[in-house]
A protein has these predicted regions:
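Catalytic phosphate/metal-binding cores of nucleic-acid and nucleotide-processing enzymes, i.e., regions
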Residues: 175
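A polyanion-binding, active-site-adjacent surface
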Residues: 2-151, 157-172, 186-200, 205-213
Length: 215
């Protein structure tokens, strides 16, 4: 099974030139591309992702070279202890193409797909304006339709609000969800606390929320 939807690459490269750092590559979603159990939707990639640089020859996928997102997946039993420990022990410069590929192959096996609403890579973590996220709205909906996940987990107020087209407070969604229709097909969306970066303090709340979802 393919780990990425390569038909998206050309458009994402164009958008990177418009909205991302010109010296970096965009980061497309990756993982289980056919009926994943979880479709995790986060914000946007930064230069902390080691696969965003021109010298990288392997899969360009979310969160490579970072640590916190893998803790979330481990706590959700979506990542093995062995793989998790390696993500935490490696320095960014020690991540390589082989381990990164095996990591996403494991996620695919565990029915996980990771992506960002905006795929344009920035040099730092400064917030993107809503208008940039909205440029990726159509592409993200296509991403959901092509993968056909059992559920979409949208992380954070900003991502959830833009994606759902209304003001969202994730604290109001402890036991509820939203439904979206894409090409006459319904998908359940579960707004959830943002678990990394500025939202690291909310990781326990995000884990509790995701574990409460019955699929």
């Amino acid at each position: 099974m393919a780990l990425q939807i390569k038909s998206f690459f050309k458009e994402l490269n164009k958008l990177q030139k418009l909205y991302g750092d010109p010296g970096l590559f965009p980061i497309c979603g990756a993982g289980c591309t056919k009926n994943p159990r979880y479709f995790f939707l986060l914000m946007n990639p930064t230069a902390r992702n080691v696969s965003a640089f021109s010298g990288w020859k392997g899969i360009r996928a979310p969160w490579l070279g970072t640590k916190n997102i893998w803790k979330l997946l481990f706590k959700l039993n979506l990542l093995s202890g062995k793989t998790y420990k390696k993500t935490q022990s490696l320095k960014p410069s020690q991540w390589d193409e082989d381990f990164s590929l095996k990591l996403y192959q494991e996620l695919a096996k565990n029915k996980v797909y990771l992506t960002s609403l905006a795929k344009c890579t920035q040099k730092d973590a400064r917030p993107l304006p809503n208008r940039v996220f909205k440029e990726y709205f159509k592409q993200t909906r296509n991403e959901i339709y092509k993968t056909k996940p059992k559920c979409v987990i949208s992380f954070g107020n900003q991502v959830s609000s833009i994606f759902l087209g209304k003001n969202v407070k994730v604290s109001d969604y402890q036991s509820s969800s939203e439904k979206i229709i894409i090409n006459n097909r319904a998908f359940q969306v579960f707004p959830t606390y943002y678990p990394v970066g500025q939202g690291l303090r909310n990781m326990k709340l995000a884990i509790k929320r995701i574990k409460s979802i019955n699929l």
